[in-house]
Amino acid sequence: MSDKVLPINEIYTCLQGEGKLMGVPHILIRVSGCRLRCQFADSFCDTPYSSWKPEKGKFTYKDVHEFFVKHPHITHTMITGGGPTLHKEMLIKLCEIAKKNYQHITIETEGSEFVSTMGDLISLSPKLSNSTPKPGTIMPYTGKVVTEADKKKHEKWRCNYEAMSQLIENHPDYQLKPVISNEEDLEEVKELQRILGVPNDKVYLMPEGLERSQLNERRRWLTELCTREGYNFTDRLHIIVYGDERGV
């Protein structure tokens, strides 16, 4: 198995923090690099080390295989980012290794690029207009000013409907997991559903926030909205338990 270092900056065990498998033990593989530059109402991207300032890779295919071997009691894997579908050949190979180790595979993606894989669940998190970066503000992780180029790049890729449709059609299961900042975001969610043909029971609305206080502010009205409109609600378990920490 190759010893080439891959654009993977984290591998660890955790409970899935979001979506239909929330609370299920997973092996998380985080891929570095993303086309988007998310900035929400109260927060930036929660993994800026994979997007705004992507770290270099640290792991090989051999490392990934050995991690599976060391954790045989965990049967679910999520491959996330960053944007894992940007690294097509690597993603296909990671899925092959995971399947050889009897894993259920979730691929978490913003949906900007299509790739057909052995993944079991596509966790599709298309970014609404509430994620568009604001030129002139400071990105805390990098200390740099957000530019018009950041905004232009983000807007170019945040809603690739063709790629999202192909991801849905070419995998056994999927969920749509948009980040919600305010009630007005619901109109964009409904438009996404209309374009992609997604029923309500496949949608998990998730409150924006990197701090417990931010989640608390949105949780009540969002759960009420989900009940009223017939959507699933998903919390952010890792933030509730650990706050904005890495490796959890």
Where are these regions (language model features)?
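Short coil-to-beta-strand transition motifs
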Residues: 2-4
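Conserved AdoMet/S-adenosylmethionine-binding subsite of the radical SAM
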Residues: 65, 85-248
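Short, solvent-exposed loop/turn segments at secondary-structure boundaries
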Residues: 21, 55-57, 216
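Short secondary-structure boundary/capping segments within folded domains
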Residues: 17-21, 33
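Short, histidine-centered active-site or binding-site loop motifs used for metal coordination
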Residues: 33, 49, 209
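Conserved Radical SAM active-site core
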Residues: 6-13, 25, 36, 40-122
